[in-house]
Amino acid sequence: MSNTILQNLPEGQKVGIAFSGGLDTSAALLWMRQKGAVPYAYTANLGQPDEDDYNAIPKKAMAYGAENARLIDCRTQLAQEGIAAIQCGAFHISTGGVTYFNTTPLGRAVTGTMLVAAMKEDDVNIWGDGSTFKGNDIERFYRYGLLTNPNLKIYKPWLDDQFIDELGGRFEMSQFLIANGFDYKMSVEKAYSTDSNMLGATHEAKDLEDLSTGINIVKPIMGVAFWDESVEIKPEVVTVRFEEGVPVELNGKRFDDVVELFMEANRIGGRHGLGMSDQIENRIIEAKSRGIYEAPGMALFHIAYERLLTGIHNEDTIEQYRINGLRLGRLLYQGRWFDPQALMLRESSQRWVAKAITGEVKLELRRGNDYSILDTVSPNLTYEAERLSMEKVEDAPFDPIDRIGQLTMRNLDVTDTRNKLGVYSKAGLLTAGQDAVVPQLDKK
């Protein structure tokens, strides 16, 4: 049995808790204090779109019995990691060309490292959070926590039988708070759960576990319900400018603050419901789950970045970017964003792909993920219309005689391929006939 994970409350010791101010962490904090632990509360400001007053959260923690409570501003680091993911195309989950932008894994990478670093400053070496044993976050936080503090111990009230026996459900937790003098009113429970940060929102569980339940039960928190025809959404022309792989301007306005840049991108994309997707994915433990995702700013930057990418880089570079991005996306999802194999892939794309991405893309956004690209401008474009123009051009880069020579060279590999197909045919792997997998070959 691992001695890193504590299954019983460490009485008399400092215990850090990632405190959201919600029912679960409020009840857990008060319960830990009453049972003899010394709880310290840490709240990450991730720019959550559904959080109104961050400064009130540490005050709540102190009222529930925290020895100390701190608000850690993680927004700049989160924005930087979001840009890194855009630069590397670190997204491995998509359906029908619509992408999930790994916004929750990015948030966990930042939260897991920055909160544990803050705990180390307070000499707090035991950490608890609200992740359940069935999800991805329990492993992500475990990895990032131990990477930041090798002496860290993990205590999760939701893995403690005593806590579960006494406060195993939302009703029991709310009654516990009321019995201890806190005027707690349970909110109306939604048909799904939501987790969010500045980069995106995740809606999952409960009714959304049923695949016959559609996206239309979700109330977006970063955009609009574009599927509702009664919601008026006017087309909007948007320009996005990148410099050396970094988004710097929106509609001609330059942003020196990367957090404000993302906020504005979210507002622009959110007006259209851009970046919403419905995905079935494999969790870290290989069981499948379903989620509805929002990421309007990430989607806007991704579209513009990849438009410039395809106009600037050659085919092999683009292919390697996509292959590395798929692998890096999986590593990010698994909580390995700072592992050596991930850093190697990140550095490669950020150095050799992103640095060349300078330019501006103009788009028209409509409803949901419906958009058109109107213009692409970059000093680094290798796209030159006259190279392949169907019109007659002066000083053409090649002529018909050049193409004849190029095609003649193809005789070498066409002959090799034809001979190889003959070998397969003799071996019975290919059959002749009208329904054959390849056209009939001359038997001579």
UniProtKB/Swiss-Prot annotation:
Gene3D superfamilies: 1.10.287.400, Argininosuccinate synthetase, chain A, domain 2, HUPs. Pfam families: Arginosuc_syn_C, Arginosuc_synth. Pathway: Amino-acid biosynthesis; L-arginine biosynthesis; L-arginine from L-ornithine and carbamoyl phosphate: step 2/3. It is an enzyme of class 6 (ligase). It is found in: Cytoplasm. L-citrulline binds at Y100, N136, R140, S193, T202, E204, E281. GO terms for biological process: argininosuccinate metabolic process; L-arginine biosynthetic process; urea cycle. Homotetramer. This is Argininosuccinate synthase.
